[in-house]
């Protein structure tokens, strides 16, 4: 091997080692409603940065308990703003890292085309057998659904028909599989690029429920992980925010 060729091999090897050293993994807990956009964002983030994202999807309340019990998550994308704030007050986050990455929207949805009208009158007709919602105690979208029913004066009328999913993902699954005729789900689960991906739905007016501000935060376990900070920065950037808007979320 010539001297110049050997130097080239050494240089290439050093470059590969440098890239490997800079690339890192980040463990991320993600609210179930943000599953589809996060998969898109994580894929693009990995291509753009070389970092690897290990995601877990589920209910925000469940993640809070896991984090309290020492789960290895480094970044938390919640379905509300109160849970990350609570962790922040408890000293479980990196100071100054919390921000609102999306503002969620609620939709009354059915897998059946034409079943839900664009004013939500199907709720007052009360001709359905099952109405799916996420557990309001652990899932912010479930809490929002309860608020809507209360504002419409339908709490008692629908009480016996409620089917609770452990998360907004399960609440959506109940409707998608026909186990419930309709349900309150996250708009992001049934919406892409300006239209519903199937079925029929009513975009619930924002004055019927408290704003669903969804905050992200770096947890203390991610304090020294460059991939954790890189992901949070990426979520604020143009590529991620375009994905977030495409799934029907608002931005703050």
From Swiss-Prot:
One BP term from GO: molybdate ion transport
Cellular compartment(s): Periplasm
Function: Involved in the transport of molybdenum into the cell.
First and last residue of the signal peptide: 1-23
InterPro entries: AvModA-like_subst-bd, ModA, ModA/WtpA
Species, as recorded: Azotobacter vinelandii
Subunit structure: The complex is composed of two ATP-binding proteins (ModC), two transmembrane proteins (ModB) and a solute-binding protein (ModA).
SUPFAM superfamilies: Periplasmic binding protein-like II
Protein name: Molybdate-binding protein ModA
Main location: periplasm
Family: Belongs to the bacterial solute-binding protein ModA family.
Keywords: Metal-binding, Molybdenum, Periplasm, Signal, Transport, Tungsten
Gene Ontology cellular component list: periplasmic space
Keyword Metal-binding: yes
Residues involved in molybdate binding: 60, 168
One Gene Ontology term of the molecular function aspect: molybdate ion binding
């Amino acid at each position: 091997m010539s001297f110049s060729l050997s130097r080239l091999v050494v240089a290439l090897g050093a470059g590969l080692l440098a890239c490997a050293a800079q690339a890192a993994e980040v463990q991320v807990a993600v609210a179930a409603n943000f599953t589809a956009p996060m998969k898109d964002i994580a894929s693009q983030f990995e291509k753009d940065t070389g970092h690897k994202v290990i995601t877990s999807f589920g209910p925000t309340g469940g993640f809070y308990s896991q984090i309290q019990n020492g789960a290895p998550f480094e970044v938390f994308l919640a379905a509300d703003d109160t849970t990350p704030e609570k962790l922040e007050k408890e000293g479980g986050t990196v100071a100054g890292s919390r921000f609102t990455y999306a503002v969620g929207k609620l939709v009354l949805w059915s897998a059946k085309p034409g079943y839900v009208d664009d004013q939500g009158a199907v709720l007052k007709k009360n001709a359905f057998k099952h109405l799916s919602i996420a557990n309001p105690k652990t899932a912010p979208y479930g809490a929002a659904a309860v608020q809507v029913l209360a504002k419409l004066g339908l709490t008692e009328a629908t009480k016996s028909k409620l089917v609770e999913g452990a998360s907004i993902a399960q609440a959506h699954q109940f409707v998608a599989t026909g186990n419930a005729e309709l349900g309150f789900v996250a708009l992001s689960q049934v919406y892409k690029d300006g239209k519903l991906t199937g079925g029929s739905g009513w975009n619930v007016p924002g004055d019927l429920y408290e704003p669903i501000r969804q905050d992200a935060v770096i947890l203390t376990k991610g304090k020294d992980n460059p991939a954790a900070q890189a992901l949070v920065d990426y979520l604020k950037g143009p590529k991620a925010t375009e994905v977030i808007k495409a799934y029907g979320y608002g931005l703050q």
